[in-house]
Structures are given as structure tokens and as C-alpha cells.
């Protein structure tokens, strides 16, 4: 049961919920009040657009009342200039302070991930986080030990052997953390294989997390080396507790130990191609 309910004392019969329903299951009968037939409920993709679009706050669904939603005003979103500055000013951070992100901030960042877009609104994402620097230290130590064991056993793919051999030696001999960059936290987003587009869902979630985290003053970096290591050393993926059939990617984050007072300069316009229909 999707519990689609319309408060008839508020409903103006404007039809916006009908027009915006992607599954086209909301209908207006002779009385003009929107409704959903029981046999159509299985087609609902649970997007809640009907609740969000109703100007009179007359629609509730899944037992969720519109009064509990966040009101959106003209100035609720960042300005275009703010977004351009954020995208241009976002940097991959590879220097971190040896401190935990505050639990309250981390909670906010993780909770908002429930709002990231996913294909067909499947929302089949798992967010695996290391939220404490001591836990990260232990995970880092285990990761380098597993990498070193794989190097010694000769079980690494040839194209990764020299790189991870160097990374393991740098950690063992100099304490240089090439893979995790000394970050106190790690987020791995994974998607189940029954997702409509698992790889895209994972990338979108991390992109949203990155921009939100950097707005909160945190540093982030996409950890392709972590994924490379997990693919080369399966025991490391098991150590992270990831389901074996999930698509995944990782991001390091924490309080930055570096500040960038200006953007870099890139000419992206040269890569724009207009399609002439």
C-alpha cells in the first residue's frame, strides 16, 4: 500500500500531481479529486513528486505528511554564481589534519545522501563509512599488509604490481601513505546489481557528497587507488565488508590541512560540441 491520500478540504483540483506523476497512475475522477487505483500502486516508483508538487499541501503518501517536508523558497538554492564558484573552486585534497570530523556534521552529510538521484528512483545504494580516525588507521594498516602480502605472493595483476609494490614500500619504510593520503575518513558507496544503472548511481552519490562536504569546509578526494587495490587484492574488499556483487567507488574526506585561495584556470569551452538536429 502506498497510502496515497488527498485532503479534500485543501485540494484545489489543479491536477499538478496528475501531470507530474512519472508512472501516470494518479487520476482525477468525475469528482476531480486525484486518486490511485489499487491495481496501479505497484507501478509507483516512490519518488514522492506528488507530495512535493502540490501547491496546497493536500497530498500525502507512504504515511508522510507535507507539513514535515522542508519548505522551498526562491532563495532556498545557492545562486548560479555560488554554484559556479563551488564547481570551479572544488579541489581534490590530499593533505588532511589528524582530527575526526564532528559526529553531528558527519551525520548531516550522510543523512542527505538519501536524497541523491538514482536510476528509476531505485535507491539501492549502500553507504559504508569509516567515521573515526583510529578505525581508519587500523583499516589502513590492514590494507597495506594485505597489499604487501599480495606483492610477496606474486598474486597481483602485472599492470598493478610495480605501483603497489612501491606503495607498500613507501608505507613500510617512510610511513608515506600513497593510497589513503592520510585521510581520517573513508566513504564507499556501493550499488546492488539489480539497480537500473549501478555505476552511475554510485558516481552521482559521491559527487553530491563531495560538493556538500566541501561546502561544510571539508576536503575530499576520489580514491581510485582504493578501488584499484580492492580489485587487485580481493581480501581488501572483504575487509571493507562490501557485497561481492556490488558496483562501488570510494572517497576519502576529512578536515583539510591545505587551503586554496584561488581556482585553477581551465578552458572547458573547447570541449563543447553542439548537436544540430
Language model region names:
Residues 129-200:
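Glycine/small-residue-rich phosphate/adenosyl-binding loop
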Residues 71-114:
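Extended interfacial segments that mediate partner engagement and assembly in macromolecular machines
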Residues 36-53, 69-88:
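Short microdomains enriched in Cys/His and/or Lys/Arg
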Residues 122-123, 180-184, 215:
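Short gly/pro-enriched beta-turn/loop segments at secondary-structure junctions
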Residues 16-35, 49-66:
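Iron-sulfur cluster-binding cysteine motifs and their immediate structural context
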Residues 12, 109, 113, 185-187, ...:
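Small-aliphatic-rich amphipathic alpha-helix that forms the alpha element of a beta-alpha
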Residues 112-114, 170-175, 234-238, 257-260:
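Glycine-rich, charged/polar anion/phosphate-binding loops
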Residues 76, 173-174, 244-277:
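C-terminal helix-cap and adjacent tail motif
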